[in-house]
């Protein structure tokens, strides 16, 4: 995992140099090295909890025997009464599943340059401003998010294993994948829209014309996601984190 030094320094609220931070995280137990303006961390598979700025902050302050005074901001949203958003969630594969509907967005061309630089330096490709914003949140707090074009969904959503055989999904990027019965899926009333915790389908992907969205935040159980990405030949930033386990309390 690569993290821009300037972002990490500000998030930790420290004046330490880049090399000093490398020394501290090495003492904590992480293999890391400094590159030009970036620190690369070699995170072992059992430490998925540190694949974010928030995770690194926790380790940093534990080493300093101090407590961070940073708190995640919470917002009170208007309740949605007109939609039945989620119909069914398979508890054996999904601990919790949330969708937030946002309507009437103003179309933006790009995130600001600072956020784009942070995302790119982490090795995450820039795709679309809405997707990029979700990836920014993932890098900050460790929670992968997926953004659907709301107008392309036929609500409500079901989170379940496929009940029918011969399912296929054209995933983002254009490849068509035959969906296995062992794969947890996100389905609307018209069919499969995403392979849970791995990748979304092209049919419900956001575009330059998107103005209404459904933002997914979920805890997919690691045992449900592990090895699934490999079966499909897909290695995504989301699957990398869900396989290792994300914090179910931050959704």
Residue ranges and their predicted role:
Residues 1-251:
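RNA/tRNA-interacting regions in translation and RNA-turnover enzymes
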């Amino acid at each position: 995992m690569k993290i821009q030094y300037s972002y990490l320094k500000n998030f930790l609220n420290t004046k330490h140099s880049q090399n000093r931070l490398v020394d501290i995280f090495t003492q904590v137990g992480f293999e890391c090295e400094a590159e030009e303006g970036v620190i690369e961390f070699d995170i072992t598979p059992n430490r998925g909890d540190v694949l974010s700025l928030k995770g690194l902050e926790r380790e940093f302050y534990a080493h300093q025997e101090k407590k961070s005074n940073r708190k995640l901001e919470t917002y009170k949203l208007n309740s949605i009464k007109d939609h039945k958003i989620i119909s069914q969630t398979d508890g054996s594969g999904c601990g919790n599943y949330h969708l937030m509907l946002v309507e009437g967005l103003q179309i933006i061309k790009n995130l600001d340059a600072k956020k784009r630089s942070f995302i790119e330096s982490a090795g995450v490709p820039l795709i679309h401003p809405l997707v990029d914003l979700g990836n920014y949140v993932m890098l900050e707090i460790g929670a992968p998010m997926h953004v659907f074009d709301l107008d392309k969904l036929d609500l409500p959503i079901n989170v379940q294993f496929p009940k029918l055989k011969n399912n296929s999904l054209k995933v983002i990027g254009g490849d068509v994948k035959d969906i296995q019965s062992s794969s947890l899926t996100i389905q609307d009333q018209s069919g499969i829209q995403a392979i849970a915790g791995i990748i979304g389908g092209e049919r419900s992907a956001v575009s330059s014309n998107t103005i209404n969205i459904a933002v997914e935040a979920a805890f997919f159980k690691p045992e449900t996601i592990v090895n699934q990405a490999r079966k499909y030949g897909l290695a995504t930033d989301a699957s990398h984190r869900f396989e290792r386990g994300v914090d179910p309390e931050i959704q």
